[in-house]
A protein has these predicted regions:
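Conserved hydrophobic "DFG−1" position in protein kinase catalytic cores
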Residues: 17-18, 26, 95, 117
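Short, surface-exposed polybasic-and-hydrophobic patches located at secondary-structure transitions
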Residues: 134-141
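Conserved N-terminal beta-strand and adjoining loop/helix that marks the start
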Residues: 1-25, 46, 80
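Conserved beta-strand residues within beta-sheet cores
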Residues: 12-14, 71-74
């Protein structure tokens, strides 16, 4: 089924992954993107485009595993918003780790240059665009 391999342009699912120390999982992109107001998007929460044959939670799980090698369980949706420039719906999921260690090698080195655990207060320094207010509240920042 070819449609199963095709990505949807409707949803981007991102994971807000916390470890036992309360640190947040972040990725540094290989290719920096230009955001609104000239901001350069380099660091992001792991995640990506939803395929037609998967749920939002399945997408978040797959993308986080592919980008970071961490196996996670999405436990609840934090926020949903429409991106103003590219007209996609961005869904933020709070995720817990199924294992504190990576269970696989990251499969997307062409997209992800670095994987890093950071303290919640460091997220604002890494995210150069507007941080979703519900995500900020969830992280306590």
């Amino acid at each position: 089924m070819e449609a199963a391999k095709t990505e949807s342009l409707n949803f981007i699912n991102l994971g807000i992954v916390l470890n036992k120390k309360g640190e947040v999982l972040m990725i540094r992109r290989v290719k920096k993107e230009e955001g609104s107001g000239g901001a350069v998007l380099e660091w992001a929460f792991p995640g990506g485009k939803q395929r037609y044959d998967e749920t939002r939670e399945e997408c978040a799980h797959r993308e986080i595993l592919d980008e970071t090698g961490y196996d996670v369980k999405p436990i609840r949706q934090i926020s949903l918003r429409i991106h103003p420039q590219i007209l996609v719906t961005i869904v933020y999921h709070l995720c817990e780790l199924n294992s504190e260690k990576q269970v696989a090698e990251p499969r997307e080195p062409h997209e992800v240059a670095e994987i890093k655990w950071v303290k919640p207060e460091e997220v604002r320094n890494l995210i150069t665009t507007d941080l979703d207010s519900k995500v900020a509240k969830t992280l306590g920042i």
